[in-house]
Amino acid sequence: MLVDLHMHSYYSDGSFSPCEVVELAKQKGLGFISITDHNTIEAHEEFELACQQLGMKYVLGVELDCVFGERSVHLLAYDFKVNEEFAAIIKKSRHQLDQMGVDLIKIMEKEYDHISLADYEGYTYDRRLGGFKGIHYLHDRGFTENVMDGLKIYRDYEVFYSNYDFPTVEEAIKHIHICGGKAVLAHPGKYYRNSTMEEVITDFEKLLASEIDGIECYYPIHSEELTACCVHFCEEHDLMITVGCDCHGEMSKKENEYIMGCIKKDETELKLKF
């Protein structure tokens, strides 16, 4: 049974509805899937129903923005029964993410007459385009040629994740466990592009001390060296070994990256604990 446990719907920044995600997964021959939208679980009800109707094995998930030392990282939470406290953490993280766009426009409106916070707050976009409000607003107001180029503007104006009150990894893991779920580090290759494997292992050991449950070892941009490092660490410490292609639908960046099912991994090649 082929597995892909990292994909997004239009409830965060993907371009597909939850039902369309499940239908595409079935067409691609996947058997075990999860929608892990950024800081929201709005897709869960539709996703669960679609999986049941189409006979797909599934696990409910969410991708949380977190702080890990000096890094901004993502945690994938799976198989949890959300309680009031964890729901509040998810909601707060979503608010922090949205606030980044508000703060960017507050800065930029001082330099440009044709944009304003009031204009931004009243702005809407077609969520089927994927992405998120801030980058679509910048594109529609003429600041970028391509929607994704808006990310650079956030950086140029120093609107960084590290400036916002996202939960720490330790806090997130604690609440995921209270809810009976599993906490998995998403796409380490995005944080450790220029790191040695020794540096990676050092951070993994810190995560282990925080009771992380697994690592997304198989991911489109991972090098063979990093993949092997992740797998070995998980095997050595009895952690989950997961796979995710991070499909955002039409927002997927390149032909061979971030396409649903682009990494072919059978359930028997992984180590899953749900």
Identify what each model region corresponds to:
Residues 20, 31, 38-103, 107, ...:
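Mid-domain alpha/beta scaffold segments of enzyme catalytic cores
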Residues 1-9, 15-28, 41-83, 171-185, ...:
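Charged catalytic cores and adjacent phosphate/nucleic-acid-binding surfaces used
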